Amino acid sequence: MDCCTESACSKPDDDILDIPLDDPGANAAAAKIQASFRGHMARKKIKSGERGRKGPGPGGPGGAGGARGGAGGGPSGD
């Protein structure tokens, strides 16, 4: 069977659902889906050892020092 024929690969316009974009329930559902996906991508980056920072920021190399190092306002353990 050839899967590259037009009838097998394209959907007719009748199958596409018409969803109102101003529906509050649809907006809430979309926000939950987006938040879940962003969390998934963040966990994936952390697991692979990458950082989500785009440049040196507070606590990063050359930064102002945060909770992990540098001149912070926390206890030094002396």
UniProtKB/Swiss-Prot annotation:
GO molecular function, one term: calmodulin binding
Family statement drawn from the similarity comment of this UniProt entry: Belongs to the neurogranin family.
Residues that bear Omega-N-methylarginine: R68
Transmembrane segments: none
Stretch list, region Disordered: 38-78
Annotated function: Acts as a 'third messenger' substrate of protein kinase C-mediated molecular cascades during synaptic development and remodeling. Binds to calmodulin in the absence of calcium.
Site (Crucial for interaction with calmodulin): R38
Recorded domain comment: Neurogranin is intrinsically unstructured; however, upon binding with CaM, The IQ domain adopts a helical conformation.
Composition skew (Gly residues), residue ranges: 55-78
IQ domain residues: 26-49
Collagen-like domain ranges (all copies): 50-78
PTM remark: The N-terminus is blocked. Phosphorylated at Ser-36 by PHK and PKC. Phosphorylation prevents interaction with Calmodulin and interrupts several learning- and memory-associated functions.
Modified residues (Phosphoserine): S36
Tissues of expression: Is highly enriched in brain. Accumulates postsynaptically in dendritic spines of neostriatal neurons.
List of residues that carry Citrulline: R68
Keyword Glycoprotein: no
Protein known as: Neurogranin
InterPro entries noted in UniProt: IQ_motif_EF-hand-BS
SMART domains attached to this UniProt entry: IQ
Gene3D superfamilies: 1.20.5.190
Short name of any one Pfam family annotated for the protein: IQ
PTM sites of type N-acetylmethionine: M1
Presence of the UniProt keyword Secreted in the record: no
